[in-house]
Curated annotation (Swiss-Prot):
Topology relative to the membrane: Peripheral membrane protein
Organism of derivation: Bartonella henselae (strain ATCC 49882 / DSM 28221 / CCUG 30454 / Houston 1)
EC number(s) given by UniProt: 7.6.2.10
Gene3D superfamilies per record: 2.40.50.100, P-loop containing nucleotide triphosphate hydrolases
UniProt similarity note: Belongs to the ABC transporter superfamily. sn-glycerol-3-phosphate importer (TC 3.A.1.1.3) family.
Oligomeric and partner information: The complex is composed of two ATP-binding proteins (UgpC), two transmembrane proteins (UgpA and UgpE) and a solute-binding protein (UgpB).
Enzyme class: translocase
Subcellular location: Cell inner membrane
Lineage, broadest ranks: Bacteria, Pseudomonadati, Pseudomonadota, Alphaproteobacteria, Hyphomicrobiales
Keyword Nucleotide-binding among UniProt keywords: yes
Record gene name: ugpC
Record-given protein name: sn-glycerol-3-phosphate import ATP-binding protein UgpC
Length: 348
């Protein structure tokens, strides 16, 4: 069992730069929680604080109700996987796996038992006698994960472990990490700037921006109900399309039934209906700026009233650049926000 609690965490450097500001977060036992956000949002710093590699300016850290602020990293029972594999090049895979256990004076029989178990889980049994230079990038990352698995810690921390891998291998490793974490049941925090990784791996996602939490929720909650314009823009590929409420009302010729504070609307690229359906939603007559083929469909950048929209079409277009394209956004597919606060609003 490992429940992580962060209470009023603040991290400010001596030069005055505030990295994390009054952050509160609880990670449930056996949960895989993913921290996602742009570079500089504080996600990796938060991970390093939990690991004990950075000290907090103020706030409290607990694991299973035990305060760990002043504990040394080695005494926190936490294992961390980094972006760089950090394997010892002169040692075999087996040597890398057993190194930490030997330092802790773990009995030899127990070491062999743990290595056998980890190697089987990670499918690296054939590579135990090889050196890291004889392995592919994906195999090296499995060995790096094996080193933390054999320790059997209370908590796993992953700091962008897949960012050095190509797209196809990254997708494969995401599935393997998710399967592995479920099998072991170890409470885990995973940091990434890649929203696709976050959506694939997470039980819950924490979206961070400028040292603060924008939203916490399941992948589908974050995607379907973004609480801020930042989340709406950051999560989703392509991201949401935004337009001014007054501009849309002028286009439609009537007012829309949103709360008074709503002055910004947004819609996902995939919700559109190709063609004109005025009884179902808002019809847009646009001009094609760019067509990006994606398998059997395409993403289309269109120009409308000084706005550039990206829409997703699940068929191949015969249109060309500069041609007209009409589509409809169903009424229920619009999200409503307030520009000043950046927060989601509710319909009347």
């Amino acid at each position: 069992m490992a429940i992580i609690q962060l209470s009023n965490i603040k991290k400010q450097y001596e030069n005055g730069i505030l990295v994390i500001d009054d952050l509160n977060l609880t990670v449930a036992d056996k949960e895989l929680l993913v921290l996602v956000g742009p570079s500089g949002c504080g996600k990796s710093t938060l991970l390093r604080i939990i690991a004990g590699l950075e000290q907090v300016t103020s706030g409290e850290l607990y694991i299973d109700n035990e305060r760990i602020n002043n504990r040394e990293p080695a005494d926190r029972d936490i294992a961390m996987v980094f972006q760089n594999y950090a394997l010892y090049p002169h040692m075999t895979v087996r040597g890398n796996l057993e190194y930490g256990l030997k330092n802790r004076k773990t009995p030899k029989d127990e070491i062999n038992k743990r290595i056998t178990h980890a190697a089987k889980l990670l499918q690296i049994e054939p590579f135990l006698d090889r050196k890291p230079r004889q392995l592919s990038g994906g195999q090296r990352q499995r060995v790096a994960m094996g080193r933390v698995i054999v320790r059997q810690p209370r908590v796993f921390l992953f700091d962008e472990p897949l960012s050095n891998l190509d797209t196809q291998l990254r997708a494969q490793m995401c599935i393997e990490i998710k399967t592995l974490q479920r099998s072991l049941g170890t409470t885990s925090l995973y940091v990434t700037h890649d929203q696709l990784e976050a959506m694939t791996l997470a039980d819950r996602i924490v979206v961070m921006n400028k040292g603060a939490i924008e939203q916490i929720g399941t992948p589908m909650e974050i995607y379907d109900y973004p609480e801020t314009t930042f989340v709406a823009d950051f999560i989703g590929s392509p991201s949401m399309n935004f337009l001014d409420r007054k501009t849309l009302e002028q286009h439609l010729g009537h007012s829309l039934s949103y709360s008074q504070e709503t002055d910004l609307l947004a819609f996902r690229p995939e919700v559109i209906l190709l063609g004109e359906y005025p009884n179902q939603g808002a019809v847009f007559h646009t001009q094609i700026e760019l067509i990006k083929p994606v398998g059997t469909g395409c993403h289309v950048l269109t120009h409308w009233n000084n706005n550039i929209f990206t829409i997703e079409i699940k068929e191949r277009l015969t249109h060309d650049y500069g041609q007209k394209l009409s589509f409809t956004v169903p009424h229920q597919s619009f999200h409503s926000f307030n520009k000043s606060t950046g927060k989601r609003t509710r319909e009347n």
